[in-house]
Amino acid sequence: MLANAIGSMASILNQFLGYAGFYLLNAAFEGASALANMLLAEPIVTESQASREKHPLRALPEQFRQLMRDSLHVLRTCPMAVKLIASSALISVPSYLTKMFLQQRLVELGWPTELLFLPLLLGGLACVAGTEIGRRVRCRSMRRLYTACALLCGVGTLLVGTAPAWGGILGMMLVQGVLEVYLLHESQKLNDAIPSDQRATLISVDGMAYSLLMIPASPLVGAVGDAFGQAGAGLALLGGVIVLSGVALLRKKPQES
């Protein structure tokens, strides 16, 4: 997160590197990352993992089907995992959209494009701060934590969509920081709720749920902004939805602590 924040400052080097330079530099970093990933190995946690054999390519389709059956079984028998996955997907929708549409709003408000790295830098620093705060937060109830984080994320999204330039930047920082607090505890609870053998797959499902929500959310937010002639209009609507999701939990009787 800190590297991404600092990397956002690379926009000021645009006049020296150009698009080709940035792509080549990115390719070099990705290549180094791929080499590092090749050194990773799965830790052996359970006996079934220790006795696992390598399968030929022709067996992969059946292995995939079995993996899907096992994952669906875990989701059916663990409602908590489903709730956690759904909550993280919904509350994470503003994460990318606030950063992207804030840049459009800043340009509309007269900001020079050379300074658009600044909100991305501050957003990355807010993520770092949110992670540090999150590990100090004692979560006794995911329901209450979601309610608090949804209200704060919703307010932050509303600020990005409606406030002046610095108010929008502060709103985006609020969204990024609060999300790190919630997602830190959500991932811990999800890890505890699912078996080790299905953990990697279901964590991927966690990310996939967010991607599926972004498919309609991103064009919808943009379409609302185009309809009203303001980039922030769609964000204001999105912020209201996130706030309502938190308010809705306030009216529900707690079922878990």
Predicted regions and their residues:
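Substrate-agnostic recognition of the 12-TM MFS/MFS-like secondary transporter fold
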Residues: 1-15, 23-38, 42, 87-104, ...
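Helix-loop junctions on the cytosolic side of multi-pass membrane transporters
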Residues: 19, 23-29, 33-56, 250-257
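Alpha-helical transmembrane segments of multi-pass secondary-active solute transporters
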Residues: 21-26, 116, 145, 202, ...
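Structural signature of the two symmetry-related core transmembrane helices
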Residues: 27, 144-159, 239
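Juxtamembrane intracellular "pre-TM" segments in multi-pass secondary transporters
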Residues: 43-86
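Hydrophobic alpha-helix/TM-entry signal in multi-pass membrane transporters
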Residues: 80-85, 146, 168-169
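Juxtamembrane helix-start elements in MFS-like secondary transporters
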Residues: 111-120
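Helix-loop junctions at membrane interfaces in 12-TM secondary transporters
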Residues: 159-172
